[in-house]
Amino acid sequence: MTIGLVGRKVGMTRVFTEDGVSTPVTVIEVEANRVAQVKTVDNDGYSALQVTTGKRKASRVTKPAAGHFAKAGIEAGRGLWEFRLNENEGSDIEAGSEITVEVFNDTKLVDVTGTSKGKGFQGGIKRWNFTMQHATHGVSLSHRSNGSLGQCQTPGRVFKGKKMSGHMGAVRCTTQNLELVRVDAERNLLLIKGAVPGAINGNVIIKPAVKA
């Protein structure tokens, strides 16, 4: 199954097993994902589900987007996401239908995608885990500097991709093979063991693990 869900990161807590073992979990609220469009190979060149979730003020919805949602007969959401489908998937799903957390009832491991927390401009030690130079013994100005940037006259430049200071975080990333501890269909919650990318209230995409 490649169909996933779009949710909102609520925060972290812990749950206890029957043996009294504490398990840290991330709580993800998954409102019903409304299907805005079903893409097919004949019409679009590939198979996919386009979904939305949440709400958005009518004044914040562009006219083309409003028409797109109205065509599917659904309420405008806070964004649009796509899930690619295999050949034998999605045949029973139509535009305007809803997908809930119950699709994960038989799933044990998931992959979670989100936007990592932005850290701003950071040096090499924090950004790339470089080792600090000595605090003394001849080091006076470069305790936290990156060190050498490369060779001298040959090649006479800094190679592309060199790990240096710069903007850290605020990038799309995925954490794989996280254990799905609990599916709460009544409250539309997923409890996932451990941490997931992103800040509280950030959008996250939950899919069945590809390496399970």
Curated annotation (Swiss-Prot):
- Please give an example of a GO cellular component term from this record: cytosolic large ribosomal subunit
Pfam family membership, one: Ribosomal_L3
Keyword Ribonucleoprotein, does the record have it?
yes
N5-methylglutamine: residues bearing it? 153
A molecular function (GO) held by this record is: rRNA binding
Question: Is Membrane among the key words of this record?
Answer: no
**Protein's GO biological process:** translation
The record's function comment reads: One of the primary rRNA binding proteins, it binds directly near the 3'-end of the 23S rRNA, where it nucleates assembly of the 50S subunit.
- Check the record and name the PANTHER family matching this protein: 50S RIBOSOMAL PROTEIN L3 (PTHR11229), LARGE RIBOSOMAL SUBUNIT PROTEIN UL3C (PTHR11229:SF16)
Q: What name is this protein filed under?
A: Large ribosomal subunit protein uL3
- The source organism is Colwellia psychrerythraea (strain 34H / ATCC BAA-681) (Vibrio psychroerythus)
List the lineage, top down. Answer: Bacteria, Pseudomonadati, Pseudomonadota, Gammaproteobacteria, Alteromonadales
| Gene it is expressed from | rplC
